[in-house]
């Protein structure tokens, strides 16, 4: 009896690491010390001495049951980018610049090519966010998970000067809310998605005119990463007063998280067109509109609040980063919360 007979293939683990090295290499930043394969990842803080009070911000997240869709479609090259997006977008909400990222993959069986493909998506997300993939873990769990299934989680650390942390504390009535378009469902609410649609090959591979693609392609579209857009906004000299990443809980749960007491957000639903995938989900699943806005991003993945004088500069910076911004509402005095009208 040996370890391999028990279901853990050490050689497969070694092969996975070798296959993923080429992807990881493309994410490196000058501050990274050492290479892949050590017991830990090291990152120099020397280049941040210009900050008055350098402050680390961190985030951890996963992709929820969206991974189930990757299994069903046998498509694993974008789910890693989803994981990165969920972490770095949260860091960006605090005004942070993502520095590095670590991933954790648990699988029933280590198929090296599949693991490397997952990591290629992680690396792509890191490149979009400008952060280094400095470490990770692939854990083989025979008997605990089915052989063809896996789960992944991510951990990211960023930096911001303390004076630049986005807190929402100085929001004022009249401040403008600008939302950036999402790429689709992003990475939450997939348990409901799997109840709305039959999760079989025929259903997922059916082309829909209203979507302009198959259902599976629309659902598996990788989560948009907003780090570059927020970086461009900052470099344009705009001070973002508050920021909300629209994830699980949709508008109703996430927008109040950026508000101080005594400030109320008003969102105009007609300020942009809700993407077809959400319209289809509501129709096919007979999901009430309020539940949709309380579960999904409904086409807006990130919302920032800025002074009215900064609106034009903010929109221009977001467009320069390749994002699509909309003026979606404003801040008013009142009970902390959000109204959709």
Please describe what each predicted stretch is.
Residues 151, 164-211, 215:
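Short, acidic (Asp/Glu-rich) active-site segment that either coordinates a divalent metal cofactor
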Residues 17, 116-119, 190:
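Hydrophobic face of alpha-helices
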Residues 17, 49, 64, 140, ...:
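Residue-level detector of flexible, active-site-proximal loop/helix-junction positions
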Residues 1-31:
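N-terminal amphipathic/basic leader segments beginning at the initiator methionine
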Residues 9, 61, 174, 245, ...:
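Residue-level signature of catalytic and energy-coupling elements of molecular machines
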Residues 16, 20, 42, 87-88, ...:
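Buried hydrophobic packing segments
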Residues 22, 28-183:
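Glycine-rich phosphate/pyrophosphate-binding loop regions near the starts of catalytic domains
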Residues 2-6, 114-132, 145-150, 202-204, ...:
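Glycine-/charge-enriched secondary-structure boundary and capping motifs
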């Amino acid at each position: 009896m040996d370890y391999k007979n028990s279901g853990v293939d050490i050689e497969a683990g070694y092969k996975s690491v070798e296959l993923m090295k080429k992807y990881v290499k493309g994410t490196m930043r000058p501050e990274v010390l050492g290479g892949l394969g050590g017991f830990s990842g090291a990152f120099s803080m020397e280049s941040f001495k210009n900050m008055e009070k350098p402050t680390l911000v961190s985030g951890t997240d996963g992709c929820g049951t969206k991974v189930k869709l990757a299994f069903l479609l046998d498509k694993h090259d974008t789910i890693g980018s989803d994981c990165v997006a969920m972490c770095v977008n949260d860091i960006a909400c605090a005004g942070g610049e993502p520095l590095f990222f670590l991933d954790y993959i648990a699988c029933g069986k280590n198929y090296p090519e599949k693991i490397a493909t997952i990591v290629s998506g992680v690396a792509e997300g890191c490149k979009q966010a400008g952060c280094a993939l400095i470490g990770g873990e692939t854990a083989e769990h025979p008997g605990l998970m089915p052989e063809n299934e896996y789960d992944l989680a991510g951990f990211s650390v960023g930096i911001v000067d303390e004076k630049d942390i986005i807190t929402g504390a100085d929001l004022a009535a009249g401040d403008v809310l600008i939302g950036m378009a999402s790429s689709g469902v992003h990475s939450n609410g997939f348990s409901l998605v799997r109840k709305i649609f039959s999760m079989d090959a025929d259903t997922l591979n059916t082309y829909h005119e209203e979507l302009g693609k198959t259902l599976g392609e629309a659902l598996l579209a990788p989560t948009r990463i907003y780090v570059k857009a927020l970086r461009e906004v900052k470099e344009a000299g705009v001070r973002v007063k508050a920021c909300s990443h629209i994830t699980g809980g949709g508008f109703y749960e996430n927008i109040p998280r950026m508000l101080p007491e005594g400030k109320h957000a008003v969102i105009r639903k007609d300020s942009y067109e809700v993407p077809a995938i959400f319209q289809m989900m509501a129709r096919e699943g007979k999901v009430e509109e309020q539940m949709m806005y309380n579960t999904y991003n409904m086409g807006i993945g990130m919302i920032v609040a800025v002074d009215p004088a900064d609106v034009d500069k903010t929109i221009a910076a977001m467009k320069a980063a390749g994002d699509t911004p909309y003026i979606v509402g404003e801040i008013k005095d009142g009970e902390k919360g959000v109204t959709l009208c």
